[in-house]
Amino acid sequence: MVSKYRHVGVIVTDMEKSIEFYCDLLGHKKLVDFTEKGNYFSSLIGLDNAEARVVKAGTPDGTFVELIQFTTHEAIPPATTKFNAIGCNHVCFTVDDIESLYDRMSSRGVKFVTRPLQSDFDPVKTCFCYDPDGTLVQFVEIAEPLEWEQN
């Protein structure tokens, strides 16, 4: 059985821009920055002679984002970035002040789908933006504990 959510892996094309987004703008702490290569790595991911720079950026609850920039294989753009595309769609972070986050990130050129919106059915505000490579990132500000999250 699964005991805990650990991380989300994000393939990036410019590690420095991604570190700026996830660490400088969102406040993740850069935990490690290393090169992954060798037989183990290539076998694990199914790419011959793979090498990648990996940065793990953590949140206070112990989960982290694993940023991966391949140095031996060209990054393949997704077939679509539409919200209804099948598969892993977005990563979501809980934040304390979504309006301030939106203002700060917008002023730094981050593209948002919309301003933060109040949910019609839960005491939350939420919005989506795009990271430097177009990955959808959601933010949620929770005004009061959600009953279904308490169980």
Where are these regions (language model features)?
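Residue-level detector of high-confidence beta-strand sites
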Residues: L31-D33, R115, F139
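Generic structural signal for helix capping and beta-alpha/helix-loop junctions
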Residues: G38-Y40, A75, D122, L146
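Vicinal oxygen chelate
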Residues: V12-E16, T59-T63, Q69-L136
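Short, solvent-exposed beta-strand edge segments and adjacent coil->beta transition regions
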Residues: S3-H7, A52, I86-H90
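Core segments of cupin and vicinal oxygen chelate
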Residues: I11-G62, S100, S107
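A generic structural micro-feature
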Residues: V2, G46-N49, K82-A85
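A short, polar/charged loop-to-alpha-helix boundary motif
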Residues: P145-N151
